[in-house]
């Protein structure tokens, strides 16, 4: 099921805190702190997200304090 009607905001950030049940505190590029959970594809492929990792986060325009981690960026990559 895809969400084509809702325009999601995609940003990059750094994981600052690892919480329980696949939840993470992420500091975005603009300085905001959001609570983000791991997307299903990352969970299914057993991709580990650790403290200090750069990640791509999707935010809903309705709640800018919660997000979904959609991609773990490689170390040293700019995008």
From Swiss-Prot:
InterPro entries: NA-bd_OB-fold, RNA-binding_domain_S1_IF1, S1_domain, TIF_IF1. GO terms for molecular function: ribosome binding; rRNA binding; translation initiation factor activity. It comes from the Eukaryota. Residues 1-74 form the S1-like domain. It is found in: Plastid, Chloroplast. GO terms for cellular component: chloroplast; cytosol. Transmembrane segments: none annotated. Pfam families: eIF-1a. Induction: Constitutively expressed. The keyword Protein biosynthesis applies. CDD domains: S1_IF1. Keywords: Chloroplast, Initiation factor, Plastid, Protein biosynthesis, RNA-binding, rRNA-binding. Belongs to the IF-1 family. Component of the 30S ribosomal translation pre-initiation complex which assembles on the 30S ribosome in the order IF-2 and IF-3, IF-1 and N-formylmethionyl-tRNA(fMet); mRNA recruitment can occur at any time during PIC assembly. One of the essential components for the initiation of protein synthesis. Stabilizes the binding of IF-2 and IF-3 on the 30S subunit to which N-formylmethionyl-tRNA(fMet) subsequently binds. Helps modulate mRNA selection, yielding the 30S pre-initiation complex (PIC). Upon addition of the 50S ribosomal subunit IF-1, IF-2 and IF-3 are released leaving the mature 70S translation initiation complex. This is Translation initiation factor IF-1, chloroplastic. It comes from Chlorella vulgaris.
